[in-house]
Amino acid sequence: MPRTEEANQRIREERRGQILDAASRVFARKGLAGTRIADIATEGEMSQGLIFRYFASKEEVFAAVVEKALQSATSLAQAALQQPCSPLEKLRWLLQIYLPGMWYKPDYALVMLYALNSEDTPQEVRELALEQSKLTLQLYRQLIVEGQEAGEVVQGDPDMLTLAFAACIQGLSSSVLHLPRTLGVDGSPDPEIVLKILKA
């Protein structure tokens, strides 16, 4: 029996996701300039032709990986705001998901940081990254302000506290490939360490 359009769409989405996952690993190691479509195909154990069925160039793949990473970060912050708990518990919930995910599968986070900081990043991708990052920071700020109003987060300039919180998370993301081995660390960071920055 022929597959339904719904089944075909699901297969297309799965294959696209497989391409992006493989690409995220390669871009995290090699950057945009050092990556070829052939590298992504080898990493994902797929043909170059399959990749070109979904993307016209490696730049398109890179943009899609960055978009997925940014949307994941924003969606997590939005979900944290909706949790039925206190503001500090919302922040803890966010970190309990984000930190292990970033620690054990760091590729998307590393590509996101690369997109924000590398001169190789196409201008339109950089603008998308900056805009989406701004939205995520606004959500972090909202969580912090709620915490201040509840007396759970230290008083002070919420913009500076947001900066410190985001910088801590990004610092962990950027160091995940080398610092754990250097320090002999086993396991993802304890959310409580990050929360100490904010606790009243």
Where are these predicted regions, by residue range?
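Helix-turn-helix
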Residues: 18, 26-60, 64
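Generic hydrophobic, amphipathic alpha-helix propensity
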Residues: 15-23, 40, 65-69, 73, ...
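Short secondary-structure transition hinges
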Residues: 99-139
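Hydrophobic/aromatic-rich alpha-helical bundle segments in the mid-to-C-terminal region
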Residues: 109-113, 123-126, 130, 148-194
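N-terminal intrinsically disordered/low-complexity leader segments
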Residues: 1-14
